[in-house]
Amino acid sequence: GYSSAASDVYKRQTSVCIPPAYVKQVKEYVQDKMAVCTVIGFPNGYMTTAAKEFETRDALTNGADEIDMVINISDVKNGDYDKVEQEIIALKAECGNRILKVIVETCYLTEEEKIAMCQAVTNAGADYIKTSTGFGTGGATLGDVKLFREHIGEAVRIKAAGGVSTREDFEAFLDAGCDRIGSSSGVALLTKKA
């Protein structure tokens, strides 16, 4: 059995994010004790919207509770913000009441593009804007989180991922306005003494 400390950590973690191929197996294991999340369009978001819709439906059928989608960075770089927004709308429609997080991969975007993505995510009705996949050239920064907080709608939450590895980082990102932190060091962050 779990010790009380381990049990407390388990309760404080919101979800576990895993590859789509393992959603069904992990959902059967965790059942309703923890939300199961998977990433659609990983890692660069270059597939078509139809492919992302299929991938989303498949993940939800297999038991995913939350979907993280990767935007098509090329569409952003080409200034086709409406196309990005329409894709988010399509995937949110597939998700229904389930949580949709939109990964914008901030390390590749200019400030103008980040602000445009805040607007697209807000307009499309997504639940979260997320900084990064963890596979880009950089992860979350406090500056990006503060920029998001200034430019997203009130209903949109912020998730920082990548680069949050110490208790000090964790607290700084929460103070900057994050609603969730994605970290491969989650258990260690929650169990270390302050």
Where are these regions (language model features)?
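Single conserved hydrophobic/aromatic residue that forms the stacking wall/gate
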Residues: 1-6, 10
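Hydrophobic faces of well-ordered beta-strands that scaffold small-molecule active sites
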Residues: 16-18, 36-40, 67-69, 100-104, ...
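Catalytic cores of alpha/beta
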Residues: 47-56, 109-120, 164-179
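Active-site-adjacent beta->alpha loops and helix N-cap segments on the catalytic face
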Residues: 18-33, 47-51, 74-94, 109-114, ...
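Generic structural signal for hydrophobic
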Residues: 8, 59, 91, 120-121, ...
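Structural motif
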Residues: 11, 62, 94-95, 124, ...
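Glycine-rich phosphate-binding active-site loops on the catalytic face of alpha/beta enzymes
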Residues: 42, 62-75, 126-138, 163-166, ...
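Conserved, mostly hydrophobic/aromatic
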Residues: 26, 59, 102, 129, ...
